[in-house]
Amino acid sequence: MNLTINALTRNYQGKGANRRLRRNNKIPAIVYGTGKPPSKITLDIFEITHLLKNEETYTSVLNLIVNKNKEAVIIKNLQRHPAKNSITHIDFLRINLNQSIITSIPIQFNGEEDNKAMRLGAVLNQFMTAIEISCLPTNLPHSINVDISHLTIGEHINLTDINIPKGIVITALTHGDIETHNQSIAIIQEPRKMAEIEENILVKAEDSKNKITKDNETNKDKSNL
């Protein structure tokens, strides 16, 4: 996929300047990496919003053109307004196409319709939604596909069970002791088990709330002494 983003350098910074940019349908951004100084830029809100409608934009190598100069980048961080969900700022990371990069890629679970246990009412409990990987930019996948069609009730799928494409490394499994870092990413569970887990979470939250209230009352009593 060949995706291009046009940008202009900006000389002003700060909350006031950024608000003025957004009022004029521009988004503040920054690009850094490969040993070069960071560069503050502005993006057209309509262009970047259109590109981000395609989920693959988040995990693709992008052509960033700043004042007619082209650089290869990936989106490193994207900030949104907490209430409006509109884009407020983007960080781009410059990359060398001949050097490996480390980034997080979303997990795509496949085979739910073919899973016998799930057809009978079992549910998939996900522990992870993304995996940190290392690879050359040219090998960067848009998602990590995980087949769960064969899983039975109570069966986990771990990092080492994932069929990773050639040229891609799961960083968690490069720290020496694979057994220690071989995390479970999902399990097939009975609906009853899921309900018990949710109930336990609620009970723990309530216990924690009661403890805080009790501690506050104790501290209040002490302050009156």
Swiss-Prot record:
Keywords: Ribonucleoprotein, Ribosomal protein, RNA-binding, rRNA-binding. Pfam families: Ribosomal_L25p (PF01386), Ribosomal_TL5_C (PF14693). Transmembrane segments: none annotated. SUPFAM superfamilies: Ribosomal protein L25-like. One of its GO terms (molecular function) is structural constituent of ribosome. The keyword Hydrolase does not apply. The keyword Ribonucleoprotein applies. It comes from the Bacteria. Residues 206-225 are annotated as: Disordered. GO terms for biological process: translation. GO terms for cellular component: cytosolic large ribosomal subunit. This is one of the proteins that binds to the 5S RNA in the ribosome where it forms part of the central protuberance. Part of the 50S ribosomal subunit; part of the 5S rRNA/L5/L18/L25 subcomplex. Contacts the 5S rRNA. Binds to the 5S rRNA independently of L5 and L18. HAMAP family: Ribosomal_bL25 (MF_01336), Ribosomal_bL25_CTC (MF_01334). Belongs to the bacterial ribosomal protein bL25 family. CTC subfamily. This is Large ribosomal subunit protein bL25. The gene is rplY.
